[in-house]
């Protein structure tokens, strides 16, 4: 059977046009999403499978995107091991019992994500039934470091000083935490694949806060172990593609090839061809338009998107995306026009 365009690109196979999807493609910029959000809290939407499935499908019905991504959040996974999570107005996520010591880490519970985040697993099943063969479905998780950073800081942070302090001062406690989170993330992604996810993405939103040497020592081995675990445990041959996306990591791209991910996501802080050269020819790349570009006039959006496609130079293995999630102020029509443009412009090139 012919692979969907997105899955073919993940495996660096020729496609008739560049596949496109957008991080946070189901979100506040869409009126359909806002209509649901007016009636439900964010975590209620995440934890109600029928709502999460409906929201996941909204972009597929509105735009010619080549993949769906399950509507979920990275942080509820932490609730299962004993952390207390709320979303506060104007503050974002808050962990009310952050991890600040080896004793805090030792007190974490063992848990099975199939039970603790069963609502997301069920949402994946519902979406797969509705999608049928129309488009692949992407599952995802936060990567161990990013989850650890939220758990230690108690929420978002500009400098991650508490996380780094724990990492440096209590290296054994740090390893214990990362091993626990690696086990959780691996099991969660495997459960998503078992439920029908066709590919999975690891979001390492905060890894760019680290020095390269610290990333290599304290983070990379656990990303590698996650990917090994998922491939070995998912029961699918060949295993579904795994995407690794870290924000602010342009200075570490050469190291990211060591993750052994099938696809490396690039943010907007590097030219796509330069980033691809650094991760190497044996890896597909995803990206990398600055999401704020979508606030510009269409002529500017088109020019910048064309530049990215030109830099990809028709090489198999490029998935067009943004360098981060769609921002709430983005015009819906710009998203639609961009998806159409990527297909039309890239189809004029030869993909072989």
UniProtKB/Swiss-Prot annotation:
Query: Which Pfam family, giving just one, matches this sequence?
Result: URO-D
What is the main EC category here?
lyase
For this protein, what is any one GO molecular function term?
A: uroporphyrinogen decarboxylase activity
Q: Name one GO cellular component term.
A: cytosol
Residues carrying the site annotation Transition state stabilizer = 73
Please list the reactions this protein catalyses.
uroporphyrinogen III + 4 H(+) = coproporphyrinogen III + 4 CO2
Localization of this protein = Cytoplasm
Q: Its Enzyme Commission number?
A: 4.1.1.37
The record's PANTHER family line, in alphabetical order, gives:
METHYLTETRAHYDROFOLATE:HOMOCYSTEINE METHYLTRANSFERASE RELATED, UROPORPHYRINOGEN DECARBOXYLASE
Q: What does this protein do?
A: Catalyzes the decarboxylation of four acetate groups of uroporphyrinogen-III to yield coproporphyrinogen-III.
Q: Which family does it belong to?
A: Belongs to the uroporphyrinogen decarboxylase family.
Put simply, this protein is called Uroporphyrinogen decarboxylase
Native source organism of the sequence: Roseiflexus castenholzii (strain DSM 13941 / HLO8)
